């Protein structure tokens, strides 16, 4: 999947993958990670997600990485946050006192940026990749996370032939097969969310499950 695909999605505001509210699984399960308030939390492919505001409200230092510049700028403007912009290597660094977003390719993000991270949150990153690229992303995420880091992974699963992503379908079997080498995995929840997603109903997708996993980097 080329970067131009995502840039065009944001330019055309075809961002059905963006949630207007804080993810319910984040609200329900984040406290189970038992993190101190000043924890550094990494959010890959963060977009302009309101979930980052929730994490900041818990006292965390949020470190996000997002390919699209428009998404990053919208996050700060939509939430009326004054930020400072600098250049860090190949990435543009937008930051407030508590939130740092690195705009650029996650595959070239320096590991020094996440070396003090002890937690992570992936709601829209794993499901953003087609299956042909997903395992490569999963390995990159693991390489950016120090051993012992804990995180919340949220996925969607549905019959992939019924709808072209993103978001793409990620099954529990895929999670186990491709993440278990690098993470300890605990299933927290799985529920049918089809009724809450009109886009999937309109496309006659027969079922849609959202799942939450607790991951710990080995």
Swiss-Prot record:
Keywords: Cytoplasm, Methyltransferase, S-adenosyl-L-methionine, Transferase. GO terms for molecular function: thiopurine S-methyltransferase activity. The keyword Repeat does not apply. Its EC number is 2.1.1.67. It comes from the Bacteria. GO terms for biological process: methylation; response to metal ion. It holds the Pfam family TPMT. It is an enzyme of class 2 (transferase). S-adenosyl-L-methionine binds at residues 10, 45, 66, 123. GO terms for cellular component: cytoplasm. Its main location: cytoplasm. The keyword Iron-sulfur does not apply. It catalyses: S-adenosyl-L-methionine + a thiopurine = S-adenosyl-L-homocysteine + a thiopurine S-methylether. It is found in: Cytoplasm. PANTHER family: THIOPURINE S-METHYLTRANSFERASE. Belongs to the class I-like SAM-binding methyltransferase superfamily. TPMT family. This is Thiopurine S-methyltransferase. It comes from Shewanella baltica (strain OS185).
């Amino acid at each position: 999947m080329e970067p131009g695909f995502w840039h065009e999605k944001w330019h055309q505001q075809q961002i059905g993958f963006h949630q207007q509210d804080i993810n319910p699984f984040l609200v329900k399960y984040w406290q189970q990670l038992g993190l101190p308030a000043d924890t550094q939390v990494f959010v890959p492919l963060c977009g302009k997600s309101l979930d980052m505001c929730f994490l900041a409200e818990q006292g965390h230092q949020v470190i996000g990485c997002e390919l699209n510049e428009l998404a990053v700028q919208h996050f700060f403007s939509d939430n009326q946050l004054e930020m400072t912009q600098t250049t860090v290597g190949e990435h543009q660094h937008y930051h407030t006192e508590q939130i740092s977003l690195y705009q650029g390719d996650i595959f070239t993000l320096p590991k020094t940026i996440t070396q003090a991270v002890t937690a992570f949150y992936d709601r829209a990153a794993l499901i953003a990749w087609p299956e042909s690229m997903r395992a490569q992303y999963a390995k990159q995420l693991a390489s950016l996370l120090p051993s012992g880091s804990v995180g919340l992974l949220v996925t969607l699963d549905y019959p992939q032939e019924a709808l072209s992503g993103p978001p793409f379908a990620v099954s529990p079997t895929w999670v186990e097969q491709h993440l278990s080498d690098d993470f300890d995995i605990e299933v927290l929840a799985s529920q049918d969310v089809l009724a809450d997603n009109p886009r999937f109903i309109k496309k006659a997708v027969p079922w849609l499950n959202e799942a939450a996993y607790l991951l710990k980097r080995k």
